Amino acid sequence: MESAIDTHLKCPRTLSRRVPDEYQPPFAMWMARADEHLEQVVMAYFGVQYRGEAQRAAALQAMRHIVESFSLADGPQTHDLTHHTDNSGFDNLIVVGYWKDPAAHCRWLRSAPVNAWWASEDRLNDGLGYFREISAPRAEQFETLYAFQDNLPGVGAVMDRISGEIEEHGYWGSMRDRFPISQTDWMKPTSELQVIAGDPAKGGRVVVLGHGNLTLIRSGQDWADAEAEERSLYLDEILPTLQDGMDFLRDNGQPLGCYSNRFVRNIDLDGNFLDVSYNIGHWRSVEKLERWTESHPTHLRIFVTFFRVAAGLKKLRLYHEVSVSDAKSQIFGYINCHPQTGMLRDAQVSPA
């Protein structure tokens, strides 16, 4: 048994864990490890927004263009594709890329082909919406948790190895305790979301300034290789409860501190669904996320179901990654997206 916080990220605690040192978790879980040379990662969500079947072909082509741009110099180490329909009735395709070198990401983002495509007048006139939501947490600003040990998705794919069984899981507050920065920092939000360019109500190009310790969670489910019993467990028991919780946050998350919640399904380049899904949640703070997970009936049902089945999982793959980041390490840009998209809903617009 080992600590979730890797040796080179440990420091003298000024903030205590939620459990005593002799705590033993009820089942095995693991996390992704990186060597001490990893200083920061980039989690980049590139979206294409459209409405209805008439725009689907154009949206898929735009998605494929983004994927093709990943093959340019300094592209990401891994990526995946998703679809979801939001509560305003718009379809959204998201290409998610991960970099383990923020300088490489910066060079890629500023490269002539990538920059020219985003800046083109065509983006304003082709009838689609686009967004970029990018966070670059430092090594001490994110944690991961896996119920399996191979082929890690998401940020795990750019890490170096899997841990041994970890101590910090299976209790309320364990998410926070897995953050290396939690040893000395409460990870409190530093300000509010602010629109710094454009007007969400008018469409066009809009830029939102984030804030320190804005929290991003990706919580995933992969039943592609699961056999009949586990597929039934996921589709008939876990998924309905999970869907209820995710829909609740999507529709009612604002007063809870949830800026945006998207329950997405993985797809291939042609838009065909895969048996993989995950939730993308942006929150004001870790504390706001904790408060919901520990108290809301929908999440309590999810938690109870997971606890009941976790020890027996074979090919059903469940995981999550949670990060905070500094405002200077965030990018939130939107082009012709409806005003409920992503950070637009809760961002404050400065008086004219």
Curated annotation (Swiss-Prot):
Matches recorded under InterPro entries: Dimeric_a/b-barrel, OXD
Reactions the enzyme catalyzes: an aliphatic aldoxime = a nitrile + H2O
Positions contributing to heme b binding: H299
The entry's keywords: Heme, Iron, Lyase, Metal-binding
One GO molecular-function entry: metal ion binding
Temperature dependence: Optimum temperature is 30 degrees Celsius.
Binding positions (an aliphatic aldoxime): S219, H320
EC numbers on record: 4.8.1.2
Record text on activity regulation: Active when the heme iron is in the ferrous state.
Active site: residue positions: H320
Record keyword Heme present: yes
Known cofactor(s): heme b
Keyword Lyase: yes
pH dependence: Optimum pH is 7.0.
Subunit architecture: Homodimer.
Protein's job: Catalyzes the dehydration of aldoximes to their corresponding nitrile. Is active toward various arylalkyl- and alkyl-aldoximes, but cannot use aryl-aldoximes. Involved in aldoxime metabolism via the aldoxime-nitrile pathway.
Similarity comment: family membership: Belongs to the heme-containing dehydratase family.
Name of the protein in its database record: Aliphatic aldoxime dehydratase
Taxonomic lineage from the root: Bacteria, Pseudomonadati, Pseudomonadota, Gammaproteobacteria, Pseudomonadales
Gene name per UniProt: oxd
